[in-house]
Amino acid sequence: MVGVAPRIETRRARDCPACWDLSAPEKATQVVARPRMDEAPSPEECMAHAVASLQHSDLMSEIPTSDTFQALMTRYAPGYRRSRSDTFPLTDPTLTASQLVSQAAQADHWRRIVSMTKEYILTSVPHTEAPPASDVDTLLAWWHLRLVSLWKLHFFSNLQEEMQALWQVLESVRVYEGDDLRVLVDTPHVSFPMHVLRAQVLLQNDRRRGIQLLWKHMQRAKEASADSIWRARYIRVALLLSSLLVEMDALPAATSLADELASGLGSADAKLALVLCRLYLQMSDMASASRMLSRAKSAADPADAALHAAILNHETMTRFISEPHADHEKLVVDDLKDVDQALTNTMALDAFFHGHVLESIQILERLMHEHPTTFTTTRALAPNLLTLHSMGANHPQEEKQRVIRFLVQSAGDDPWFVDQRAG
């Protein structure tokens, strides 16, 4: 079964070599002095060229016909054939484009969003001789949404291909910024989140370069962190960078970042304290993890049931890691009204490890029926439930068929397309 993290591997710190100079200098921002007006293109011409360049259909790749959901169906229901409804954009003349996208995102229909963003990139901005600068902002916003959707679908090869193609445009097209002619990538048109996403994509093939860019973006956000928006950006990038450094066993650098975030914790930063708790657990720093857990408890709003569930989940993980071979009492959370998916999976694993397979099944079944969207879009839950049913004594094949039909129905497809031999 796929666990939330009842056991986190202890990592040994490696010497941080000199080549990990995360503050490596970047090349200077390209600023092209504005030449005489009889030689230079006009601002309107530059903007029109930028808009046209961002709307090239060649920048977008062909999307695969299968995704994570399809892979699950292929494994457990080989006769299943997905309907075409999820591969086309939603249409409703009463809703705006942003409302349609919001609906699709809430339902985790990222494939639909990919289809919609392609249409909007190609058609939402008309070709004119003097487009406003906001047209570039609009197109880049749709591009950002498209790239995030590809990430959500785990279409990483498509993501890398499209990001590379887009970045070539951003680094070659020039627009005016005041009296200077700059490459588009160095202007405010390219948002901070887009820069961070590009660094994350680079991590797939060039981890060192990706980390250096994340470090650069983190420092930029830190310098402006007096503003609440930039502080939130600084925290997000610092957490991302810390996690990557832990994965690389660069524990001194990861610890330094985590300690810096911990020292700046406010009285209401319960959620951040929990994230830091998890980071310290991954680094096997039990003392710091316990300290962050205590900070989260003291800062938590008693009325926030979801936060209470997350705290309980981290308490459980800390207990398992501290004493992995101890015979712990079973985890009981009957008083919680809202249980998040991570805690639910931990509860199911806890029951399973105590030999209570049927109780483990009941815990996951309850979440499946009460929160179907959460269940069908969380990767560990469905495989774990199907695995548990395989261990059950009462008609495992029929039970797995029932779960598969529920998953298909929740995805908006016809459940009777599932092969009767599945399971």
Language model features: what each stretch is:
Residues 107, 153, 205, 248, ...:
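Structural motif corresponding to the intra-repeat A-B loop/turn of tetratricopeptide repeats
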Residues 216-299:
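Solenoidal tandem-repeat scaffolds enriched in leucines and small polar residues
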Residues 124-135, 172-189, 221-232, 262-267, ...:
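Flexible helix-coil transition and linker loops at the boundaries of alpha-helical arrays
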Residues 130-209:
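Helix-rich alpha-solenoid scaffolding regions
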Residues 1-93, 113:
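Intrinsically disordered, low-complexity acidic/proline-rich regions
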Residues 97-103, 145-147, 152, 190-201, ...:
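"A position-specific structural signal for the A-helix of alpha-solenoid helical repeats
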Residues 289-423:
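Structured C-terminal portions of repeat-based eukaryotic scaffold domains
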Residues 113, 159, 210, 254, ...:
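Single-residue signature of alpha-solenoid repeat helices
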